[in-house]
């Protein structure tokens, strides 16, 4: 079942985030609360077994990936992070969250979903997931101030 993220889910989210921190930005209780306060979409599935946090293009959230996307596209929903607990992977939870996120975007007339996936360190499973679910590569970017490189993806939902 998909529902809102509540403070009771924070501990599990922080634990999952830490497991995958090589692909995700680190989080604390405070930074998670701030992230959720600014997020357009913040849902969990199966009592926190998975989460998806996303932003509209005009959300009050400053981040280098969102900044890059704002310079490339006019109107979009951005997937900031999706995390599925190790024990729940392979059960279709990410797909269910993405489908729900897509419904939310369509209900607001948003023409595309966008995200980035690490290429350094490479997150091969995430690349495969996004391609399988209709996302197309946009561009590979290496940030000079970081050890991380990403590939941006987009999925068209509506004509602009």
Regions found by a protein language model. Name each.
Residues 1-30, 46-49:
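Short amphipathic alpha-helix that is part of the acyltransferase structural core
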